[in-house]
């Protein structure tokens, strides 16, 4: 009987030890964001109840960035990496801290605001008075946006610039291949941010080249 009680006590002690060990293990999931917005360049999406406009200068032209559309294989919180020409891996413990389309729009808006410094830049969705003041809208359809740690990141996207009345002013396709500086997921995400910055620069260049009489035609 005493031996039986001793065995039970040992088992209970082991169970308690495993329980404490399990409680001590932290969640291994890591969360990432794309790029890092310059202070004051783009307003937080948390203020969705108010017009989310950002004044990048003293100009009167308003640029709207969005919507951004991502393919279904990327429309998830997990980061997706390329493992072959036709294969990908969905990472369980490496996730986006925000919806991917929101992160893409944020970085693009940041680049446009920085490179078209006399314009107002707003992020989709916009409402009320802000919606009525937009002269240029950038719509982006992402075709591919993935990479491999220690290798390259590929961003392939079609994008359009629309006038405030819906007329198409430009239609382009951009493919950006960005090298990943070293192994690991954080460097890969950083490379994804740089690829988006390159796309944002292309969009800003196109906007700056648009004839300013577009505003007068509104």
Region roles according to the model:
Residues 59-129:
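N-terminal segment of the mature soluble domain
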Residues 19-22:
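C-terminal motif of bacterial Sec signal peptides marking the signal peptidase cleavage site
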Residues 25-48, 115-165:
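Surface-exposed short loop/turn segments
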Residues 24-48, 116, 182-218:
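C-terminal/domain-edge helix-coil "capping" segments
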Residues 88-97, 165-205:
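Short secondary-structure boundary motifs at beta->alpha junctions and helix caps
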Residues 2-12:
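Bacterial N-terminal signal peptides that target proteins for export
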Residues 9, 39-58:
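Intrinsically disordered, low-complexity terminal tails and inter-domain linkers enriched
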Residues 62-69, 80-82, 137-141, 154-160, ...:
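Soluble periplasmic/extracytoplasmic beta-strand elements of cell-envelope proteins
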